[in-house]
A protein has these predicted regions:
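Surface-exposed binding/hinge segments that line
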Residues: 157, 187, 201-257
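Append "and occasionally in soluble cytosolic enzymes with long acidic Gly/Pro-rich linkers
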Residues: 30, 56, 149, 294, ...
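N-terminal lobe/hinge region of extracytoplasmic solute-binding protein
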Residues: 69-71, 77-78, 91-92, 110-160, ...
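Ligand-site clamp/hinge motif
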Residues: 271, 297-342, 500-502, 507
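Aromatic- and charge-enriched surface segment that lines or borders ligand/interaction sites
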Residues: 49, 154-202, 228-230, 321-324, ...
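Long beta-strand-rich cores associated with HINT superfamily self-processing modules
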Residues: 77-106
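Gly/Pro-rich hinge or "lid" segments in bacterial periplasmic/extracellular proteins
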Residues: 117, 123-126, 133, 141-147, ...
Length: 554
């Protein structure tokens, strides 16, 4: 334990070094060094040096204690035996366009409750990405084996220095209203998504393109047949970006045809009937109840789309969702009540699939919880609370789906961009907890937590927090039995040493808005990688990122 405590203290010293340039005293880490390091990673052309910089970035991130990994994701779903052809990938994307339902031309399903955004540039949720895939398209996509393949493009050419890509568009592409879809639509869409005034959460994903954010070096040919993209540095995951929904095309005429579109850029897709380009169009939307997607006859591969309709039940109540599935009202669901999982594991309709991501708890670094503390003391508080969480218990009693406990933010199995796996000990890098290949062990460590809290100025009577120095905060989560059960486990773990945690549950959209705005102390969170490179899970914490829910640098 002493060895691990020393490693944690060393992490806090690292945090102290990177925050030494702070202009004002306070508990928030200065994030200038982290932002600069991510920029260096994006510009680095030596793969080994790039990997080293990404490890350095994760070291800084984990030293704050603001990210508390709980477990590494996998995914579950239930599918009637009459359904075939649905596929998913490591990034949580689900593809329904080639599904079939025996004896029916309609697939009835549930993914989530009311979506936050249907504009692919503004979406930031996995469920929203699945809806975007059903109704829009990008230059590339994924096949059933998880491999990249051309979609609205037919291929590309890359310059010898890796800095220029020229994509050739598929001929005859149409929007759902019959208008031509060309490279000019992609030029417009990317520049819109990157522009500060659009305020897209994923705008930072365009920052490897020259001219980001306001003068993106993306140019369509005069005839709209090709799209040329100029990069600041070679990008090994360029084609992965081409398959990501933020890079999908949206119709300029529809986007800008809504009154007040400048102030509300996603308003054009807030009701059924908006123009799409993918296999389906949204034709009916009863908000907070249901959505109906109908086959798009103008989709370039419409002849291979066998379904006529997708009917979505909108709900986050997994008890109601499972009841609907049992009653035969839906054919596909991807959540079930926690207390049903063990009974379902031998059911042939129950499926587990791999994901590349991390379920975690995040702290708002601007919370009053850390008022009066130094940067190092605030980090010690957060790291201490992490050591009190029984991850194995959460997995065994709540997750129950063979998840693995997490002790680093970057998940197991993620590539390192240099021909290997990132989360491993090797000659180039060794994790602080070498034995467990992470930043700390998996076991609850009450003694270590108490030592860290004492470092942060808290007093103890034995193993209980003294009434002289109480800790009390609120935990934010959305309305889902699994997420609430995890919150209750953490609440119990912290209560064992006298820490008071109350739980606030909200519906999905309120939860997202409050977490994004920093209206919380501690919140449940999770990130499934958008592509297989650590930079995806590191650049989301830059000051400018729309996914920086922790409020680093703000």
């Amino acid at each position: 334990m002493k060895k691990l405590l020393a490693a944690l203290l060393a992490m806090m010293m690292l945090l102290a070094c990177v925050t030494a340039a702070m202009a004002d005293e306070g508990s928030e880490p200065d994030w200038t060094a982290y932002d600069a390091l991510i920029s260096e990673v994006k510009a680095e052309t030596d793969f080994a040096a790039r990997e080293a910089k990404m490890h350095e970035a994760e070291d800084i991130l984990m030293a704050t204690g603001a990210i508390v990994p709980i477990y590494y994701y996998n995914d579950l779903y239930m599918q009637k035996e009459t359904v075939d052809g649905i596929y998913a990938n490591l990034f949580g994307f689900k593809f329904f366009q080639y599904a079939t339902v025996e004896g029916s031309d309609t697939l009835r399903l549930n993914l989530a409750s009311e979506p936050d955004h249907l504009d692919p540039a503004l979406n930031s949720s996995v469920d929203g990405a699945c809806l975007a895939i059903a109704s829009f398209g990008g230059l590339y996509t994924y096949d059933a084996e998880g491999n990249l393949k051309p979609d609205f493009a037919t291929g590309y050419e890359m310059s010898e220095d890796g800095l220029t890509y020229t994509f050739t568009m598929r001929e005859g592409l149409k929007w759902s209203d019959g208008a031509d879809l060309t490279a000019k639509d992609f030029e417009y869409s990317w520049k819109r998504a990157a522009a500060p005034e659009t305020a897209a959460d994923y705008s930072y994903m365009f920052n490897g393109i020259k001219g980001y954010p306001s003068d993106l070096a993306v140019t369509a040919s005069e005839d709209g047949a090709t799209l040329t993209v100029e990069l600041d540095a070679p990008c090994a995951y360029m084609l992965d970006l081409m398959a990501f929904p933020a890079f999908y095309a949206v119709p300029q005429q529809a986007v800008e045809g809504i009154e007040g579109w400048q102030e509300n850029p996603g308003a054009w897709a807030n009701e059924a009937g908006f123009v799409t380009s993918g296999p389906f169009t949204l034709t009916d939307w009863t908000h907070n109840e249901s959505m109906v997607y109908t086959k798009n006859p103008n989709y370039y591969d419409a002849e291979n789309v066998k379904l006529e309709k997708l009917e979505f039940m909108l709900s986050a109540d997994d008890t109601a969702i499972y009841a609907a599935y049992q009653a035969g009202d839906v054919d596909f669901i991807d959540s079930v009540p926690t207390d049903e999982i063990q009974n379902l594991k031998d059911n042939p309709e129950f499926h587990l699939i791999d994901n590349l991501g991390t379920y975690y708890v995040c702290f708002n670094v601007k919370s009053d919880l850390f008022a009066g503390k130094t940067v190092e003391q605030a980090a010690a508080m957060r790291l201490a609370l992490s050591k009190l969480i029984d991850r194995e218990y959460i997995i065994d009693t709540v997750g129950q789906c063979e998840q693995k406990p997490a002790n680093a933010f970057i998940p197991e199995g993620m590539a390192d961009g240099n021909g290997g796996v990132f989360k491993t000990n090797d000659d180039a890098y060794t994790y602080p907890d070498e034995e467990n290949v992470g930043y700390y062990g998996y076991d609850v460590d009450v003694e270590g937590a108490i030592e860290l809290l004492k470092e942060a100025g808290f007093e103890f009577d034995g193993e209980m927090l003294s009434a002289n120095t109480p800790i009390s905060f609120e935990y934010l989560t959305n309305e889902s039995s699994g997420h609430i059960a995890i919150a209750e486990c953490i609440q119990q773990d912290l209560a064992a040493v006298g820490i008071t945690m109350t739980i606030r549950t909200c519906d999905w959209n309120v939860f997202l808005d409050d977490r994004k705005a920093g209206n919380y102390d501690v919140a449940r969170n999770g990130w499934i990688a958008d592509f297989n490179d650590p930079i995806n899970m590191l650049e989301m914490w830059t000051t400018e990122s729309g996914n920086n829910d922790v409020q680093f640098g703000r």
